Design a protein with these regions (language model features):
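Surface-exposed interfaces of beta-sheet-rich extracellular modules
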Residues: 58, 137-163
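A short, amphipathic beta-strand motif
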Residues: 100-116, 180
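Hydrophobic residues in beta-strands and at strand termini
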Residues: 104-106, 144, 172, 182
């Protein structure tokens, strides 16, 4: 079965649209659910769920809370240290030339949101930073909240004057900040 999956994945990745989606989605997941604060919060939540049973487990199978807590800390550290390596594997595997950091912001605060690739960072996270791969197109869309309308994007290193298109299709080459301005 594994050999068939390898063939299927290999063929899918030959399709440039699928390849780009795969790479962008991978970046989106690293930029969101695999970030250290979320992993720690999820791990702590799960730890709190099982905490009442840990002493009983240790009585039966040996161990202690110090070892348990050290194991959790090691898991969190492994995740945090894994992120740069995971990005480098994608960059190497697909022969990409580098990574860029995009900063997204909304003005005025609370007037809208920004959708990037397959995610929409929470309003409480603005300004938001995410790492994407050079040469792989990324779609960025400004979305107005009720009572507001999109006005423009602030100039940045990728375009010199205000950009009035709500949707941007960017092929990353350099770090850039994207600030969506809304009126309302």
């Amino acid at each position: 079965p594994s050999i068939h999956m390898d063939v299927i994945c290999s063929k899918l990745l030959q399709n440039i649209q699928f390849r780009n989606y795969f790479i962008d989605r991978y970046a989106d997941l690293i930029n969101t659910i695999w970030q250290q604060p979320r992993v720690v919060a999820t791990g702590n939540s799960m730890t709190n769920e099982v905490a009442p049973w840990i002493p009983r487990h240790h009585t039966r199978w040996s161990g202690d809370m110090t070892t348990f807590n050290n194991t959790m800390t090691n898991m969190f550290n492994w995740n945090n240290n894994r992120i740069p390596g995971a990005r480098n594997v994608v960059q190497s595997q697909f022969a990409l030339t580098g990574q860029v950091t995009y900063t997204l912001d909304v003005q005025p605060a609370g007037a809208g949101r920004i959708h990037i690739s397959t995610i929409e960072p929470s309003e409480v996270e603005y300004p938001w930073n995410g790492v994407y791969f050079k040469g792989v197109p990324v779609r960025i869309t400004a979305v107005a909240n009720p009572g507001y309308t999109f006005d423009h994007w602030s100039p940045n290193s990728l375009f010199a004057s205000n950009n009035y298109s709500q949707d941007l299709n960017i092929t990353p080459t350099v770090n850039a900040a994207f600030t969506a301005w809304f009126e309302g």
